[in-house]
């Protein structure tokens, strides 16, 4: 067995699915740390992730994100990835060696949760529900490809979701 450090679990899913909240609570339950790729990008660039995305454009942002994820995947604990990270092939390849949970949400609920923020350039449109639905359609197969477990979040408390993920992780021991 390799002595290499790796995450306990990696969370993927669309914006507003609850990855950040679930990641913090899951890390707390596992008595470990949480690393969020969006937060790492913000720290590296010194500005909000949405601003970095808008300034760099999606292709350059995804390249930066992939580099940050390379680092994040060398840390122990829980790792939470940005919603579009799975669109990058090199990221999906690296996730094959990880335990990945897809934190899933419906388009309507995802839009409701992200409506209070103005930090999501891909959702800055006159019809956020339509755009969110398009993003889900574009990314769904990528989430399925990398996920070992799917946690539905609509109508469920963070505590319930964390309990489900902990139950899944227990089956791997």
UniProtKB/Swiss-Prot annotation:
<comment type="function">
    <text>Catalyzes the specific phosphorylation of the 3-hydroxyl group of shikimic acid using ATP as a cosubstrate.</text>
</comment>
<dbReference type="GO" id="GO:0000287">
    <property type="term" value="F:magnesium ion binding"/>
</dbReference>
<dbReference type="GO" id="GO:0009423">
    <property type="term" value="P:chorismate biosynthetic process"/>
</dbReference>
<feature type="binding site">
    <location>
        <position position="83"/>
    </location>
    <ligand>
        <name>substrate</name>
    </ligand>
</feature>
<dbReference type="Pfam" id="PF01202">
    <property type="entry name" value="SKI"/>
</dbReference>
<dbReference type="GO" id="GO:0004765">
    <property type="term" value="F:shikimate kinase activity"/>
</dbReference>
<keyword id="KW-0963">Cytoplasm</keyword>
<keyword id="KW-0808">Transferase</keyword>
<dbReference type="InterPro" id="IPR031322">
    <property type="entry name" value="Shikimate/glucono_kinase"/>
</dbReference>
<dbReference type="GO" id="GO:0008652">
    <property type="term" value="P:amino acid biosynthetic process"/>
</dbReference>
<dbReference type="InterPro" id="IPR000623">
    <property type="entry name" value="Shikimate_kinase/TSH1"/>
</dbReference>
<keyword id="KW-0028">Amino-acid biosynthesis</keyword>
<dbReference type="GO" id="GO:0005829">
    <property type="term" value="C:cytosol"/>
</dbReference>
<feature type="binding site">
    <location>
        <position position="20"/>
    </location>
    <ligand>
        <name>Mg(2+)</name>
    </ligand>
</feature>
<feature type="binding site">
    <location>
        <position position="156"/>
    </location>
    <ligand>
        <name>ATP</name>
    </ligand>
</feature>
<keyword id="KW-0067">ATP-binding</keyword>
<comment type="similarity">
    <text>Belongs to the shikimate kinase family.</text>
</comment>
<feature type="binding site">
    <location>
        <position position="62"/>
    </location>
    <ligand>
        <name>substrate</name>
    </ligand>
</feature>
<keyword id="KW-0057">Aromatic amino acid biosynthesis</keyword>
<protein>
    <recommendedName>
        <fullName>Shikimate kinase</fullName>
        <ecNumber>2.7.1.71</ecNumber>
    </recommendedName>
</protein>
<keyword id="KW-0418">Kinase</keyword>
<keyword id="KW-0479">Metal-binding</keyword>
<dbReference type="InterPro" id="IPR023000">
    <property type="entry name" value="Shikimate_kinase_CS"/>
</dbReference>
<keyword id="KW-0547">Nucleotide-binding</keyword>
<comment type="pathway">
    <text>Metabolic intermediate biosynthesis; chorismate biosynthesis; chorismate from D-erythrose 4-phosphate and phosphoenolpyruvate: step 5/7.</text>
</comment>
<comment type="subunit">
    <text>Monomer.</text>
</comment>
<dbReference type="InterPro" id="IPR027417">
    <property type="entry name" value="P-loop_NTPase"/>
</dbReference>
<feature type="binding site">
    <location>
        <position position="139"/>
    </location>
    <ligand>
        <name>substrate</name>
    </ligand>
</feature>
<feature type="binding site">
    <location>
        <position position="38"/>
    </location>
    <ligand>
        <name>substrate</name>
    </ligand>
</feature>
<dbReference type="GO" id="GO:0009073">
    <property type="term" value="P:aromatic amino acid family biosynthetic process"/>
</dbReference>
<feature type="binding site">
    <location>
        <position position="120"/>
    </location>
    <ligand>
        <name>ATP</name>
    </ligand>
</feature>
<dbReference type="GO" id="GO:0005524">
    <property type="term" value="F:ATP binding"/>
</dbReference>
<feature type="binding site">
    <location>
        <begin position="16"/>
        <end position="21"/>
    </location>
    <ligand>
        <name>ATP</name>
    </ligand>
</feature>
<keyword id="KW-0460">Magnesium</keyword>
């Amino acid at each position: 067995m390799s002595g290499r450090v790796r995450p306990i679990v990696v969370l993927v899913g669309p914006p507003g699915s609850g990855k950040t909240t679930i990641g913090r609570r899951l890390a707390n339950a596992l008595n470990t740390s949480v690393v969020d790729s969006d937060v790492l990008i913000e720290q590296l660039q010194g500005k909000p992730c949405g601003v970095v995305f808008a300034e760099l454009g999606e292709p350059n942002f995804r390249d930066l994100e992939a580099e940050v994820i390379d680092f994040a995947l060398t840390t122990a604990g829980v790792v939470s990835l940005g919603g579009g990270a799975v669109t990058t092939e090199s990221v999906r390849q690296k996730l094959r060696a990880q335990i990945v949970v897809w934190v899933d949400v419906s388009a309507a609920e995802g839009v409701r949760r992200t409506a209070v923020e103005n930090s999501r350039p891909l959702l800055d449109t006159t019809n956020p529900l339509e755009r969110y639905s398009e993003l889900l359609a574009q990314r769904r197969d990528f989430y399925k490809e990398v996920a070992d477990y799917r946690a539905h979040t609509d109508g469920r408390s963070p505590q319930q979701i964390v309990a489900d993920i902990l139950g899944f992780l227990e089956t791997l021991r």
